[in-house]
Amino acid sequence: PKLVETRLPKGELNTEAFEDTYEILPNSEWLSQECDILIPAALEDVINKDNADKIKASLVVEAANIPTTPEADEILRKNNVDVAVDFISNLGGIRIYEAIIFRVVKIENMNDEDAAAAIVKDTVDLIRKQTRVVFEEAAKTGEFTRDVARRLFTPDKSDTPDM
């Protein structure tokens, strides 16, 4: 909460608000930090067979596209690290596109600000709903969260909207 309170108007971090004890670590050390939730959010394959066993978080939320290699997945599975998969966690861009192009969110007769808020709310609600479904199913079946997500949400051609 403290970090969130330091945001600047457009959401970026206000580094001037960081405490003097804030430490910038080499990029090779960020995975091994003590934390509850680890969020790889920039590059693919950053969690791999060489570093997955160093992860101390109990949950990885994949905000980047494909940040975890298949070999790392096996290590996370063995270490009981849950994964909120990228194709659910970071579906915001495609959902916003769908909302505008395919009109999956009804925004007619709304001003721009209300329309944007409605689209963001829809996107957040969808991510939360799908994540909840995955984690509830994983808890019920004992399956790895990525396996559940793939089983439940892998698209097929019938999911493609008609144009």
Residue ranges: model-predicted function:
Residues 1-32:
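Glycine-rich phosphate/diphosphate-binding loop of Rossmann-like nucleotide-binding domains
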Residues 39-41, 63:
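Short, well-ordered coil/turn residues at beta-beta hairpins
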Residues 43-44, 66:
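Short glycine-rich anion-binding loops that position phosphate/pyrophosphate groups of nucleotides
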Residues 54-163:
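Adenosine-phosphate binding glycine-rich loop
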